[in-house]
């Protein structure tokens, strides 16, 4: 990812206001600033609404795992020395349907590393949430706009990124 684009994404994330705070616990006693974690505000909910509970049937369920590609404990020393620890989302691409509630589980499989999840489009950051170690964090997403949305872990860039493609509604 280009540095200017990444800086713009972080600036949008910092500028987001009026969003709900995501409740999060620190990693192994580490104190976290949970004000950096939020769900879509009223304006963003016109594009994607997110709920921590299912208020009815979901159309699909998706599992996205954190994946350690090269880490200090088991990765090739040359790779870790040159690039640092490298992580990825698996799968890195998900397709969903417009206006169809989709339950997405985020499984952080690392016992000693926090990750986060940021959902954004070129014009706006919609949400950011913490993915604590060894936890399943689940939300119901309903996208109200077709198109391509980007996802990333801001803690592990540039490798930990992906996309969600919102397709037209399913035929009835």
Short names for language-model regions:
Residues 16-18:
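C-terminal motif of bacterial Sec signal peptides marking the signal peptidase cleavage site
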Residues 5-13:
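Sec-dependent N-terminal signal peptides
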Residues 20-43, 56-73, 131-172:
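Extracellular/periplasmic metallocenter environments
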Residues 101, 107-111, 122-124, 144-146, ...:
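Solvent-exposed coil/turn segments that connect beta secondary-structure elements
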Residues 60-101:
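N-terminal edge beta-strand
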Residues 81-82, 105-135, 139, 161-163:
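Histidine- and aromatic-enriched segments that form or immediately flank copper-ligand environments
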Residues 43-47, 51:
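Juxtadomain low-complexity/linker regions and immediately adjacent membrane-anchoring helices
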């Amino acid at each position: 990812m280009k540095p200017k684009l990444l800086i713009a994404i972080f600036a949008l994330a910092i500028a987001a206001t009026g969003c709900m705070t995501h409740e999060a616990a620190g990693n192994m006693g580490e104190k976290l600033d949970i004000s950096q974690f939020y769900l879509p505000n009223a304006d963003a909910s016109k594009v994607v609404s997110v709920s921590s509970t299912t208020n009815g049937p979901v159309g699909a369920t998706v599992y996205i795992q954190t994946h350690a590609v090269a880490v200090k404990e088991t990765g090739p020393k040359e790779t870790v020395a040159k690039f640092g620890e490298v992580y990825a989302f698996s799968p890195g691409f998900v397709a969903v349907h417009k206006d169809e509630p989709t339950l997405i589980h985020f499984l952080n499989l690392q016992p000693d590393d926090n990750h986060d999840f940021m959902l954004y489009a070129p014009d706006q950051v919609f949400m950011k949430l913490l993915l604590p170690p060894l936890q399943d964090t689940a939300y119901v997403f309903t996208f109200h706009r077709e198109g391509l949305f980007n996802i990333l872990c801001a803690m592990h860039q540039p490798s930990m990124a992906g996309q969600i493609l919102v397709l037209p509604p399913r035929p009835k």
